[in-house]
């Protein structure tokens, strides 16, 4: 399975977008849309600190990293869960795993694989440290249980050269705008050839006269007229 469009946007709402390395709430160096070294390249420690000169370009780069990360976490959830999932359940689990990295050892996964969906939903709240994460965990629990997706706009936050987040929005994206960043525009189809211009009355009359003359000449040739 893959994240739905609403699942992708919900994840961006939870993570936010920071176009430079920053320290998260538990002092893990992070970049872009929740990317850490644990997810693979790039290592946030190797990136320049502070706000980039071109924010729009930096956001596009962060989105490219996000796409690679999402594919990894989707595969992890698909590998850990051995029962059929509804789309909203899968979206909630990927969001949970993207944040915790704990899908393979979580009680909620064991309960889900045992067929205890309600117990799995309850177990989301077993991962509620630090306190700042509780609202997100409740949103993931609600999504898993009821299919209720969060709403809002994905926010691009600033950061400084020390890796501190500056809580002043630099950009915001509606879901359609964020999804457009994830997917390049469709190539334009080749233009259709222009239709032939209709023949003018004068040209048509001249062609008809030439055809009549040719037919008449043929008649004289065959019949000696």
Which sequence ranges carry the predicted segments?
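Long, amphipathic alpha-helical surface segments
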Residues: 1-9, 14-20, 26, 37-38, ...
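Short alpha-helical scaffolding segments that buttress acidic/His motifs in well-ordered protein cores
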Residues: 11, 31, 89-97, 121-125
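Generic secondary-structure boundary/loop-capping signal
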Residues: 19, 28-33, 82, 95
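Substrate-binding/active-site groove segments that recognize
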Residues: 23-48
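Short, intrinsically disordered/low-complexity patches at protein termini
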Residues: 43-44, 54, 142-146
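Alpha-helical segment that forms one wall of the substrate-binding/catalytic cleft
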Residues: 45-82, 87-105, 109, 117
């Amino acid at each position: 399975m893959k994240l739905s469009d609403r699942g992708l946007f919900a994840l961006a709402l939870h993570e936010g977008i920071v176009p430079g390395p920053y320290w998260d709430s538990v002092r893990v160096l992070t970049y872009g849309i929740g990317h850490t070294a644990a997810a693979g390249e790039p290592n946030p420690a190797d990136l320049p600190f502070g706000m980039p000169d071109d924010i729009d370009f930096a956001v596009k780069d962060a989105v490219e990293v996000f796409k690679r990360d999402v594919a990894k976490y989707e595969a992890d959830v698909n590998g850990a869960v051995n029962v059929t999932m509804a789309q909203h359940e899968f979206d909630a689990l990927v969001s949970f795993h993207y944040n915790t990295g704990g899908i393979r050892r979580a009680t909620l996964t064991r309960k889900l694989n045992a067929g205890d969906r309600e117990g799995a939903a309850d177990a989301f709240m077993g991962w509620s440290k630090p306190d700042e994460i509780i609202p997100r965990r409740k949103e993931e629990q609600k999504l898993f249980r009821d299919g209720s997706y969060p709403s809002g706009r994905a926010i691009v936050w600033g950061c400084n050269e020390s890796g501190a987040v500056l809580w002043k929005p630099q950009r915001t994206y509606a879901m359609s705008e964020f999804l457009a960043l994830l997917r390049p525009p469709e190539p334009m189809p080749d233009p259709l050839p222009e239709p032939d211009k209709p023949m003018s009355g004068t040209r048509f009359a001249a062609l008809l006269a030439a055809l009549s003359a040719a037919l008449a000449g043929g008649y004289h040739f065959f019949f000696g007229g």
